[in-house]
């Protein structure tokens, strides 16, 4: 939960994340701020697509969510689909002006754009952002990619504690 959600609304985290088996593939959801946490993304490692709906009241917030969405696509070798509320929200007491853009992100690997961006909407312009997603390509990258980030996650175990401080003089 963001500071506002915790401090103003008293919101607390819920139960485990869910994976939905659909005709479009296995889909998970990381809502906005959740996309900024690798372990939440890792819980969705079996998803082909992770949806990231968001609302941010500053461009810095948009970029944090976008960078998180791109990182989750890289780590899980999947596609992430980010949507953003944009513009004023006079209908809501909780929201001010919102900034952002939609984006469809992928691992920058074989068969995908080297930028990791399948599609990107215009900043603060309402509209749809969409791309063709080839689930066979997702499966191919997971099995035969240049790197196998998703499979090598366990290699971090034991190295993910506090780093050793080394003084160089």
Regions found by a protein language model. Give the residues of each.
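CN hydrolase (nitrilase-like) catalytic-core segments centered on the catalytic cysteine
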Residues: 35-126
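C-terminal beta-strand edge segments of enzyme domains
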Residues: 19, 86-169
């Amino acid at each position: 939960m963001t500071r506002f959600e915790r401090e103003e609304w008293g919101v607390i985290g819920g139960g485990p994340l869910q994976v939905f088996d659909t005709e479009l593939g296995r889909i998970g959801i990381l809502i906005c701020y959740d996309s900024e946490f690798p372990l939440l993304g890792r819980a969705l490692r079996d998803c082909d697509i992770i949806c990231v709906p968001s609302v941010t009241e500053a461009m810095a917030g948009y970029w944090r969510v976008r960078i998180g969405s791109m990182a989750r696509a890289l780590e899980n070798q999947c596609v992430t689909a980010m949507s953003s509320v944009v513009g004023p929200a006079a209908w809501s007491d909780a929201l001010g002006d919102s900034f952002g853009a939609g984006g469809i992100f992928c691992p920058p690997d074989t068969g995908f754009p080297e930028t990791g961006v399948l599609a990107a909407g215009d900043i603060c312009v309402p509209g749809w952002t969409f791309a063709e997603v080839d689930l066979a390509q997702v499966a191919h990258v997971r099995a035969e990619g240049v790197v196998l980030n998703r499979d090598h996650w366990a290699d971090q175990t034991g190295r993910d504690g506090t780093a050793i401080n080394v003084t160089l003089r």
